[in-house]
Amino acid sequence: MDARTIALDDSHGDVLVVAVRGEHDIYTAPMLRDRLEQALGTAPTGVIVDLSAATFLDSSILGALLEARRQALEQTVGYVVCLGEEPERGVERILEITGLVPVFPVVRSLDEALEAARSAPADA
């Protein structure tokens, strides 16, 4: 069984969750882009990228996250990254060393992410 998945969860009403699980790189970046475009294409109130089960992200994944953030800003859709309560240190670190923590609203729980996606303006 391949533990690398990217799933779209629409069970939270007006906020869609793109759940990223496992190691992701240039080979799975197109799938992430597709899921993010699919989520943004429905004109939700917000999109959450759930990285709580991600174990590795390369630069192509970071590029996909940045592009989706840009699209969310253009569409005034809330965009939040959820690292989870105990994120994989490598995932958290890559966001820190690339300077992306201030670019994305980053939270630790799905509840926090849902609240932030619904209440924060997209350009925050």
Positions of PLM-derived features:
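STAS-typified acidic loop motif
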Residues: 2-34, 53
